[in-house]
Amino acid sequence: MYPGSGNYSYNNRPSMPPPGFNGDGQGYRQEYGNQYGGGYQQQQYQDQYQGENRGQYQGQYQDQPEYGRPPSGMVRPPSSIQQGNGQQFQYSQMTGRRKALLIGINYIGSKNALRGCINDAHNIFNYLTTYCGYRPEDIVMLTDDQREMVKIPLKENIIRAMQWLVKDAQPNDALFFHYSGHGGQTKDLDGDEEDGMDDVIYPVDFESVGPLIDDTMHDIMVKSLPQGARLTALFDSCHSGTVLDLPYTYSTKGVIKEPNMWKDVGSDGIQAAMAYATGNRSALFSSIGNMVSSVTKKQNVDRERVRQIKFSPADVIMLSGSKDNQTSADTFADGQNIGAMSHAFISVMTRQPQQSYLSLLQNLRNELAGKYSQKPQLSASHPIDVNLQFIM
């Protein structure tokens, strides 16, 4: 069942909005380019989340049962320069400036509107300011219920907000990025994807300007960061497993995941089996051909070359709501519509603030298990010791 089609509980977010989306029925005006004056001015956002809205969501995660004790022997990340894959990197100590960019898009007025994404952005805002030491004036929020054009998550606004987030970043800074909205995939053109597809997110004006692809987001928010600067990214969208193109993805056992070339043939394998059972030789050969093509594409990607290209000496960590081939759920909990991954992250971190990277991933998986098919992912710009303390 798709959002807006009736009951609204535990349904999957579609991969992308359908043709014909035009916001509130009239579309968004495009005369926004000159409002920036060549730069992204922080003072535009200082008062955007004040007064009665702030604190609206406080308290809803505080009285829930805790997880087990923090992992024994857990230590903070070291401050010294590390070696990984023949290159140097450095963990952030989180002692510098804190900045955050939060994006929530409900696609208001569209046939595939979502209901929980704007709530997700506000809930993350509340979590960051209440528990993590982020100041409201250092947080930019883009949502499609805003009246000011500069605060609407148009593609150009999102790009400039990303540039603002990483501008003048220094070692030990703590940057946070959150996106809740539609996600999807498009054909990979530069050969850096093992499944042959780039992951994308959809701004409200995607029909006129296109989606925002993972390569672009990587170039803006990962490549530009200096050694020792931290970016924590949280994506609550479909097909978001590698949406920042980070080269190291970790399993719940704490090891780097290697792709199973045959694991994601999925529907082609089912179609081949059905064709064989019914004696449809034409369909059988077609399905087998698609399976071989899929596997060949993955084998043609030089994994080590990609890791070298996508490696960053900065400290970039991404938590995503689903694998590249999965959708993410939009649901209802605690009296409001929310995204399952955003809600799980806040719940897990408020119940047990002391987490290792590994325990955080495991607890996120456990939080969603039984309710949703999606499996949260943990990836990084460099090799990480998953037993270190997760700090942000």
Swiss-Prot record:
InterPro entries registered for this protein in UniProt: Caspase-like_dom_sf, Metacaspase, Pept_C14_caspase
Family: Belongs to the peptidase C14B family.
Lineage: Eukaryota, Fungi, Dikarya, Ascomycota, Saccharomycotina
Biased composition (Low complexity): 41-51
Documented EC number(s): 3.4.22.-
Keyword Ribonucleoprotein listed: no
Function, as annotated: Involved in cell death (apoptosis).
Annotated gene: MCA1
GO biological process, one term: apoptotic process
Tagged with keyword Cell membrane: no
Alphabetical keyword list: Apoptosis, Hydrolase, Protease, Thiol protease, Zymogen
Annotated Pfam families: Peptidase_C14 (PF00656)
SUPFAM superfamilies: Caspase-like
Any single Gene Ontology cellular-component annotation: cytosol
Chain intervals for the UniProt region annotation (Disordered): 1-87
PANTHER family referenced in this protein's UniProt entry, alphabetically: METACASPASE-1, METACASPASE-4
Residues the record marks as active site: H182, C238
Compositional bias ranges of the Polar residues kind: 1-14, 53-63
Root EC class: hydrolase
A single MF term (Gene Ontology): calcium-dependent cysteine-type endopeptidase activity
Gene3D superfamilies, per database record: 3.40.50.12660
Protein name: Metacaspase-1
